[in-house]
Amino acid sequence: MSMSDPIADMLTRIRNAQSTNKVSVSMPSSKLKRAIAAVLKDEGYIDDFSVQDVDGKPQLNISLKYYAGRPVIEKIERVSRPGLRIYRGNQEIPVVMHGLGVTIVSTSKGVMTDRKARDAGVGGEVLCVVA
């Protein structure tokens, strides 16, 4: 079975795992998924992530984070999708919850948060929003 949107699948796996209070979640790995996981870790939304080979295929394992028994990630949504790509300039990147959340953007300088993209003066594809 081919997967038409692996990023949406990643976000859905995280959302579903947190709704059932799982400690970790695993999924097929890619460079983009690892970059998104690195941004989530830097922003404090997940504890850690690692890549392991399972039957010769890389698997991304994400350790989820909870605070007082509740998931740290309250909202995680895909913005740009294969059927409708969303690109924004550095001043047009949306701000999530007045700066309390982050928008993850894929730029020419790598995957980064909306704040870092504005500081670097680059725009790009708006991958997802996390709050």
Curated annotation (Swiss-Prot):
HAMAP family: Ribosomal_uS8_B (MF_01302_B). GO terms for molecular function: rRNA binding; structural constituent of ribosome. This is Small ribosomal subunit protein uS8. The keyword Transmembrane does not apply. GO terms for cellular component: ribonucleoprotein complex; ribosome. One of the primary rRNA binding proteins, it binds directly to 16S rRNA central domain where it helps coordinate assembly of the platform of the 30S subunit. Belongs to the universal ribosomal protein uS8 family. Keywords: Ribonucleoprotein, Ribosomal protein, RNA-binding, rRNA-binding. It comes from the Bacteria. Disulfide bonds: none annotated. It comes from Methylobacillus flagellatus (strain ATCC 51484 / DSM 6875 / VKM B-1610 / KT). GO terms for biological process: translation. Part of the 30S ribosomal subunit. Contacts proteins S5 and S12. It holds the Pfam family Ribosomal_S8.
